[in-house]
């Protein structure tokens, strides 16, 4: 079992994320990723997600192994306004895999130019051990 999405009977299916995920296997925990050098929120999101995919590949995993993404965003108004571009950046990097997610508005991040930081947790089946 790679993972199982938790979808209680009678709950509406959330758009673009899962309320919960059950998984077993080798854990991959990634530090927060930012969009180094990218201009604007959606571009920084695209770069941060590409960084996450690169790190997953380094571990022998892929986007399909993601269990959770925690997004820290400095401008929630821009987040809401740019949903189409953010969705496109997400689909380009991750595809149609939707792990558990939280989006948290913050006043600032450690890097002054960073508009978003994304942390990731993934689990690979034990057969992916190297």
Report the location of each language-model feature.
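Short, polar/acidic, helix-capping and beta-turn segments at strand->helix junctions
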Residues: 2-130
């Amino acid at each position: 079992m790679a993972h199982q999405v938790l979808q209680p009977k009678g709950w509406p299916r959330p758009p673009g994320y899962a309320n919960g995920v059950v998984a077993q296997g080798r854990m991959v925990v990634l530090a927060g990723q930012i969009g180094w050098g990218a201009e604007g929120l959606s571009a920084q999101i695209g770069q941060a997600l590409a960084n996450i995919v690169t790190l997953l590949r380094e571990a022998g995993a892929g986007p399909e192994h993601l269990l959770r993404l925690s997004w820290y965003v400095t401008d929630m108004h821009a987040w809401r306004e740019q949903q189409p571009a953010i969705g496109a950046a997400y689909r380009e990097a991750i595809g149609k895999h939707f792990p558990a997610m939280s989006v948290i508005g913050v006043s600032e991040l450690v890097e002054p130019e960073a508009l978003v930081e994304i942390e990731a947790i993934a689990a690979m089946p034990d057969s992916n051990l190297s």
